[in-house]
Each structure stands twice: as structure tokens, then as C-alpha cells.
A protein has these predicted regions:
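Substrate-binding/access-modulating region of protease and related hydrolase catalytic domains
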Residues: 90, 165-175, 191-263, 274-276, ...
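Extracellular S/T/G-rich loop segment that most often corresponds to the catalytic His/Ser-adjacent loop
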Residues: 85, 256-330
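Subtilisin-like peptidase catalytic core
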Residues: 86, 147-223, 334-336, 342-356
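Extracellular/periplasmic catalytic domains that process cell-envelope and extracellular macromolecules
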Residues: 73-77, 182-184, 205-206, 234-237, ...
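Sec/Tat-exported extracytoplasmic proteins
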Residues: 87-99, 180-184, 213-216, 220, ...
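Active-site core segment of subtilase-fold serine proteases
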Residues: 71-179, 187, 207, 373-379
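C-terminal subdomain of the subtilisin-like protease fold in secreted/lumenal serine endopeptidases
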Residues: 210-213, 327-462
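Secretory targeting signatures
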Residues: 1-67, 462
Length: 462
């Protein structure tokens, strides 16, 4: 019996120009006209299949994107916080981890250099051992990952001594970042050394960053230009959140360039951990007040801690709380990314039939905040707190680690937080209107990368 024989071929590997040769090689025809017809039919089918393969074969970019998504789905839910400050002690045990960040995460955060640190010996011995391979070779354009730690760091300003590392005369940034980790031990830290618009924008322009935290500003909250243009980019354009420290004095926060703009979460402080009673301590009429006194890592050793106070530490503690909330919701709803890029629809959580925006996070924080009960001494702070309108001094109220669970429950819609009393709503609506009015007209100058606090007025808020 005459028949037509054919074998399987990989059409994706066959150039279109050689189709005739392929068909000739793969078809073994008999003598009858029926066999000729069968051969032509099979040839037609093969040609059609080839065009389908070409039409539906994914390009390299599509394959790369799919591979990246698969890789990210193999890792845990995460959140990225960007403290902006003096520098950070990458050698301290507080920032150590057995976890190694996946390569796709490093790529997405723009990492240009990896510094394998020495983890034996004193702080000085470790630093000396790593000078040649790491510290002496860093530039302002480097974004550096430190394996064995939770830290990716950069120093775009290039000011001071050793880039990224907290210098012996500093220490502020190490404590600030320690406060973030205390609230969310699994936070990915994208640390930026500096306190300029350039430093803030280094974090704002990172798609994976969720929260930017700044703990510096003008002494007494005097109305001078600061980082407000850059934080506006981060929140309004990039859909992130910004936590900004109010001044440590009772001066109003509304005109403060760090805590005052309506797009920022302005944070005052109250003492809690090292004090027998809670005390309202700082800036009046903020968004919220958070824990002021904390036990935080030293900048010049590997395992020491110190107790310190200030809105400088209340602010990153709040950033860590937000990070914990985001990470929890992402894990619950299958969101393997971070940030609020256009690809994520501008949403900080973009999961399975579930999204959360920066506005919704702020609303949940405001609803969860609370005013101290009768166990709190209203006269023990820097000034007495009005029992009638505490919002004028504490904003929506106090926020600490106890707020995490109700915030998550409200956002995942398992337990809704009730509305705040009408007088609180009215008070904070007035606050928002004043901030929008003030910052809508000031500063009048166009956005400028070069805007920076005058050194005469700038101070860290501890």
C-alpha cells in the first residue's frame, strides 16, 4: 500500500526560507494522485502551523517579564522602606539576617555594587578589613547591597566622610533605621544618606520603595524651604507614602517643610517605653503622634544599644508600622511586588481582586489613632494638653505597634474601624484645609533639585 510518511519537526527552529526543503525532506510520496493530494494537504497544514507558531511565540521581553514574575512569586511578601539620614552602621547585629535578597530584587532596585562585609572582630577591625574592597571604592552613583544584612544603601549627596556608613561623629541614621526594623523586622531597607531633595528623589524614583521617612528639618519649624518639592513627587506623582518628623518643640507643624505639607504624614512624639507614664512631648497639630522614646542600635560598635528620644525616632517607627501592614496584606492577597508604580495601577497593594492605595493607608491610620485615657498625665509634657481639643496638639491621636492589627483588619475588610467623633473630624478637616492653603501657594518657586535646608537652620530631630 502506497502512503505518505512524515515525522515531527520543530517549526520554531525552521527558517521561513527553507520551508520547501523541509517539506521535501519530511514528505515521502507515492505514485498515486491521492498521495499527491495528501501531501499537499499536509504541506498546507504545516505552513499554517508555522505561521501560528511565529505569530504566538513570545518575544524576549515577554519571556523576561514572565521569568521575573515567576522568580518574584518564589520569594516572600515584602515591603521596602527608605530612611533618609546621616548614614548607617551596616556592621551592627540589629541589621543582620540569614536571608539573601534574590537577584531580581537587586536588579529592580538598581544595585550596582555588592560589598561582602567582614563579620568577625570589632567594628574598627571589620571596617579596616573592608576598606580596600568596599568603602574606599564607593561613588555617589553606587547603589550597594550588603549581603548578610537587610540593607541596600546609596549616598547621592556625597557629603561627609565615608559614603553610606554612619561616620563616628554621626549615629543618627543608624538609630533611625533601627526604629524601622523594630516595627517590621522583615523590612527591606533602601537607605539613602543625605538630607537634600536629591536624596529624597533617590528614593522617590525607586519603583519598589513603599515608604520614605525623613527625620530632619528647620529648628523651631520656621517657614523656610526644605524637601517639600521632592516629597510631593514621591507621594503625589509616585503614589508612595512619606512620614515626616515634626519639630521637637511645641511649635505648629503646619508650616514645617518636613511634616507640614498635606501630602506628608506629619508626626509628633510622645514618650512611652522608658517612662512610667505617657507624655505628649512635641510639635502641635500634626497628623499623628508616635512613640518618642526607644532603645536603638549604636553606630560605632556591633551589638550595643542606647535609649534615645525625639520625633526623629517616632517617625521611622511609623514608617515601619506602615511597612508591616503592607507586607501582611500582600502576603494575604498574593501580591509579590512592592511600590506603587504604573504597572501596579498606582496601588501599594495589588493582589488577587484586592488593592490598597496610599490614601486608604492614611485613612486607616487616622481611624486607628487614639487619645490617651485617664491613666495618662496630661500635664507632664512640654505643655499641658487640652482635654477639649487634643487634636490641636496630637492630631488624630497616638499610633504605636498596637495599631497594626486594627489597621490590617480595617483594610482587609474583616473588621471596620468606626468613624471618629465629629469634633475630631472637624478639627482635622480644618488642619487639612490650612495645610492645603499654605502649601498650595508656598513655595512659589518651581521645583528644583538643588533646594536644600540652609545649614544655619537645619537640624536632626532628636
Amino acid at each position: 500500500m502506497n502512503c505518505t510518511m512524515f515525522s515531527y519537526i520543530d517549526l520554531t527552529r525552521v527558517p521561513q526560507s527553507s520551508m520547501a526543503e523541509v517539506l521535501e525532506a519530511e514528505l515521502v510520496s507515492g505514485d498515486s494522485s491521492g498521495n499527491v493530494f495528501a501531501g499537499l494537504l499536509i504541506a498546507s497544514i504545516l505552513i499554517s502551523a508555522l505561521f501560528l507558531v511565529i505569530a504566538y511565540s513570545p518575544d524576549e521581553d515577554t519571556v523576561s517579564m514572565a521569568e521575573s514574575e515567576n522568580e518574584s512569586s518564589d520569594w516572600r511578601a515584602f515591603s521596602v522602606v527608605a530612611p533618609i539620614d546621616t548614614g548607617i552602621n551596616v556592621y551592627h547585629d540589629h541589621f543582620r539576617t540569614n536571608e539573601t535578597y534574590p537577584q531580581w530584587l537587586l536588579d529592580d532596585l538598581g544595585v550596582t555594587k555588592v560589598c561582602d562585609l567582614t563579620f568577625n572582630g570589632t567594628w574598627q577591625e571589620r571596617y579596616d578589613a573592608d576598606r580596600t574592597s568596599c568603602w574606599d571604592n564607593l561613588t555617589t552613583s553606587d547603589i550597594v547591597y550588603f549581603p548578610g544584612t537587610k540593607i541596600i544603601g546609596t549616598s547621592p549627596d556625597g557629603d561627609g566622610g565615608i559614603l553610606i556608613l554612619d561616620d563616628p561623629s554621626d549615629g543618627h541614621g543608624t538609630a533611625v533605621t533601627g526604629s524601622v526594623i523594630d516595627a517590621n523586622p522583615e523590612a527591606v531597607i533602601f537607605f539613602v544618606e543625605g538630607f537634600s531633595d536629591t536624596a529624597v528623589l533617590a528614593a522617590a524614583n525607586q519603583p519598589l520603595v513603599d515608604v520614605i521617612s525623613t527625620s530632619f528639618g528647620a529648628i523651631g519649624s520656621i517657614p523656610v524651604p526644605g524637601i517639600e518639592d521632592a516629597t510631593k513627587v514621591a507621594v503625589v506623582e509616585k503614589n508612595k507614602l512619606h512620614t515626616g518628623a515634626a519639630d521637637n518643640s511645641p511649635s505648629p507643624a503646619i508650616q514645617d517643610a518636613t511634616a507640614g505639607p498635606p501630602w506628608s504624614i506629619g508626626i509628633a512624639g510622645y514618650a512611652e517605653e522608658g517612662d512610667d507614664q505617657k507624655e505628649i512631648m512635641s510639635g502641635s497639630y500634626p497628623d499623628i503622634s508616635a512613640d518618642w522614646t526607644q532603645y536603638l542600635p549604636n553606630h560605632d560598635d556591633i551589638d550595643g544599644y542606647h535609649e534615645t528620644s525625639g520625633t526623629s525616632f517616632a517617625t521611622p517607627r511609623t514608617a515601619g508600622i506602615i511597612s508591616f501592614v503592607l507586607q501582611n496584606l500582600r502576603g494575604e492577597f498574593g501580591d509579590n511586588g512592592s511600590g506603587a508604580s504604573e504597572e501596579r495601577g498606582g496601588m501599594l497593594v495589588s493582589g488577587d481582586n484586592f488593592t490598597v492605595s496610599n490614601t486608604q493607608i492614611r485613612e486607616a491610620i487616622n481611624l486607628s489613632a487614639w487619645y490617651p485615657d485617664f491613666g495618662w498625665d496630661p500635664t507632664s509634657g512640654t505643655m499641658p494638653i487640652s482635654p477639649v481639643m487634643p487634636c490641636t496638639q496630637t492630631g488624630w491621636g497616638l499610633v504605636n505597634l498596637s495599631n497594626i492589627e486594627p489597621i490590617i483588619a480595617h483594610l482587609n475588610q474583616s473588621t471596620s474601624l468606626g468613624d471618629r467623633p465629629s469634633d475630631v473630624e472637624a478639627c482635622m478637616s480644618a488642619n487639612q484645609e490650612m495645610r492645603e492653603s499654605y502649601w498650595g501657594a508656598y513655595p512659589s518657586a518651581e521645583y528644583s533639585i538643588g533646594a536644600i535646608f540652609n545649614e544655619e537652620y537645619a537640624t536632626w530631630r532628636d
